Amino acid sequence: MKEYNKSSKLEHVAYDIRGPVLEEAMRMRANGEKILRLNTGNPAEFGFTAPDEVIHDLIMNARDSEGYSDSKGIFSARKAIMQYCQLKKIPNVDIDDIYLGNGVSDLIVMSMQGLLDNGDEVLVPMPDYPLWTAAVSLAGGNAVHYLCDEEANWYPDIEDIKSKITSNTKAIVVINPNNPTGALYPDEILLEIVEIARQNNLIIFADEIYDRLVMDGEKHTAIASLAPDLFCVSMNGLSKSHRIAGFRVGWMVLSGPKHHVKGYIEGLNMLSNMRLCSNVLSQHVVQTSLGGYQSVDELLLPGGRIYEQRNFIYKAINDIPGLSAVKPKAGLYIFPKIDRDMYRVDDDEQFVLEFLKQEKILLVHGRGFNWKDPDHFRIVYLPRVDELAQIQEKMTRFLKQYKR
């Protein structure tokens, strides 16, 4: 019988957040073992619930959601997103510049498919949210990774960005707030990136899904607000801020001048039409979510769950000999470093796999985020403090077998 293999288009595509280590975790769970899953930022799994008014809107609009919507999304949702862009000072955004998607993930893939030819290059941060690298590869492009510097609060290394630009570079991706590091970029860094894009005629892709999960009195700046003369594509959604990851509500906004990207926009419209529309029922919660009381704010202040869990895991990690981490300013993740002079760790994927098998905690290895060395891993700090406390005890015990 003829064998069928995966497409050659997938040869360089990887998404290790849901890779081999997760497969082992699923096998263990199927055998009745209890696993603490710290591999994905899924708020509902850890007792975070959607605001009541969001659920009410969903129920009330069920009958009105039985048919297709406009391929870009329903008017009320796009109108609310346009007004949100105004609050964020993102310039030159009209209703037709907004696309609703089944989460930001859906739109990341679409945005790359519509832009890239074989061999085109896109600058992507290192570490990154790996879907960006995967989407570039799937579209036939090459992801060229620029360094984010751990010694400088995980901010992008501006000189490294400059050194990576070639005649094939079409765009730069900026993930801010950053996943997996939790870094929040100051305006000075963003302005330097904007200037690089300006000088090299690059499109800016801004992944800002965590812009409403900022702590310590900090403020998020949309990079598009600093680049009114540049074409920017900004991604955002409700999965994290409103604890509705399963609803799949994301959006993509085109801002700035558009006369020179008409062909690209035609491609985006074609791809948008091909998928008919995103989930109509979920689109109905956008207006209430963006216009109503932002209950997530309570979680990010002293005494709030996310704030306190962030503080706990930061101290717990740094109290473990040979581990260190930069304190996250935003988001749901921390990205600890292993001191390889103290511990014999040469394969970070094998490290987290053995940790899973021995300690029943699921993490993601650093190279799963396209980090260059096998010396990091990511922790999701969504569980309550009593569950997070297990990590300190179990990681301290586990590391002893790697001691030099």
Please annotate each region the language model reported.
Residues 2-6, 11-103, 110, 289-292, ...:
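N-terminal small-domain helix-loop-helix segment of the aminotransferase-like
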Residues 87, 162-163, 344-346, 354-363, ...:
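PLP-dependent enzyme catalytic core of the Aspartate aminotransferase-like
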Residues 114-136:
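Conserved PLP-anchoring active-site segment centered on the Schiff-base-forming lysine
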Residues 225-304, 314-315, 399:
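Conserved core segment of the aminotransferase class I/II
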Residues 287, 303-317, 325-339, 373:
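Conserved glycine-rich beta-strand-loop-beta hairpin in the small C-terminal domain of fold type I
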